Amino acid sequence: MIIMALHILRRGKMTSKFVQKINSVEWLLTDGATGTNLFDMGLMSGDAPELWNEKYPEKIAKLHKDTVDAGSDIFLTNSFGSNALRLKLHNFGNKAFKLSKISAEIARDIADYSDRTVFVAGSVGP
């Protein structure tokens, strides 16, 4: 899906920093294995990773920082399941907006901390 989006953007006339970047390089490195890494950090199977945005923001920040330090040009927010239906399963359906906002703020802080241009993409699940 990301490759398709990059192909479409390369053909366009947009001038955003992101489009300028993808037009100037052959490839961009993205993050991966977010769930696996969160399990390694203590997330339990069945838990909602999005709740960690508020409960353990330092762990989410470390996850993103490690991704950037490893060379990622783009990384996703910790918000894939941050919607009312998914969070309702954990009795936090009313916190979807707040948790999504926190995930974006944590990610943006880490991207801005980098000494190079790093892009943050919102992760939106079903």
Per-region residue spans from a language model:
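Domain-level signal for soluble alpha/beta catalytic cores
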Residues: 3-126
